[in-house]
C-alpha cells in the first residue's frame, strides 16, 4: 500500500497578507522537502484566524477574492513542487465573507473550493456567509488519484458533515483548523 503524507501546517500567521504569503510559500517548500504529497493550511490563512475583540468591519475588510493573486500563487507553487496544496482564506463574498478552502492538485489545477457550512455564532464570525454544502473531488497525487472532501473546524462537530463526504466517496477528509500555537 502506498502512503500519502499530509503536512498539517499549524503555523502562526504574520499579521499581514504579504507576510502570510511568503511564510506560507516557505512552509509548503519545507513540507515538500519532508516528503509531503499534500500541504494543508489552518483556516483563514490569508488573514489568520484573529477574530476576538476586533471590530467586525476591520475583519471583513481583510477578505480577499478566491481567484486573486494570493490564492493563485499557491496554485503555481503546487505545480512547481508537484504537490497538492490546500490554501485557506477569508473570501470576499457579496453577502458577507466566507471561510474558504481552495485545493490545488499537484499540477496546479483548482480541484475543490469549499466554504465552511457550520459557521460559529460568536464574535465577528457571525458575519460569515455559510457555504452551500459538502463536496468531494478527485485529487491527482503522486501515489494516484484519491477522492477528497473538506470541512472546516466547527463543521467537524456535526457527524453528518463527514457522513455526507463519505457517501460521496471521500477517502480523505481535509479539516483545516486554526490553532493558537506554532509547531515547527
Predicted regions, residues:
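Active-site catalytic loop in hydrolytic enzyme cores
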Residues: 63-66, 76, 92-184
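Short loop/turn motifs at secondary-structure junctions
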Residues: 5, 35-36, 82, 147, ...
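Short, acidic/polar
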Residues: 19-28, 156-163
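Extreme N-terminal starter segment of soluble prokaryotic enzymes
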Residues: 1-7
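Cys-nucleophile CN-hydrolase/nitrilase-fold catalytic domain and related Cys-dependent amidase chemistry
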Residues: 17, 26-107, 111-113, 180-184
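Generic enzyme active-site microenvironment
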Residues: 8, 41, 153
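Short polar catalytic/cofactor-binding loops
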Residues: 10-17
Amino acid at each position: 500500500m502506498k502512503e500519502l503524507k499530509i503536512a498539517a501546517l499549524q503555523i502562526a500567521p504574520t499579521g499581514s497578507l504579504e507576510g502570510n504569503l511568503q511564510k506560507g510559500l516557505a512552509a509548503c517548500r519545507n513540507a515538500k522537502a519532508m516528503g509531503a504529497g499534500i500541504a494543508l493550511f489552518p483556516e483563514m490563512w490569508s488573514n489568520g484566524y484573529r477574530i476576538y475583540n476586533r471590530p467586525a468591519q476591520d475583519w471583513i475588510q481583510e477578505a480577499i477574492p478566491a481567484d486573486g493573486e494570493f490564492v493563485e500563487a499557491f496554485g503555481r507553487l503546487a505545480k512547481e513542487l508537484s504537490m497538492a496544496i490546500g490554501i485557506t482564506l477569508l473570501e470576499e463574498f457579496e453577502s458577507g465573507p466566507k471561510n474558504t478552502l481552495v485545493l490545488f492538485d499537484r499540477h496546479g489545477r483548482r480541484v475543490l473550493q469549499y466554504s465552511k457550512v457550520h459557521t460559529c455564532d460568536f464574535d465577528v464570525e457571525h458575519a460569515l456567509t455559510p457555504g452551500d454544502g459538502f463536496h468531494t473531488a478527485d485529487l491527482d497525487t503522486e501515489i494516484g488519484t484519491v477522492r477528497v472532501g473538506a470541512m472546516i473546524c466547527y463543521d467537524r462537530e456535526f457527524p453528518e458533515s463527514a457522513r455526507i463526504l463519505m457517501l460521496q466517496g471521500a477517502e480523505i477528509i481535509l479539516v483545516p483548523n486554526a490553532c493558537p500555537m506554532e509547531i515547527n
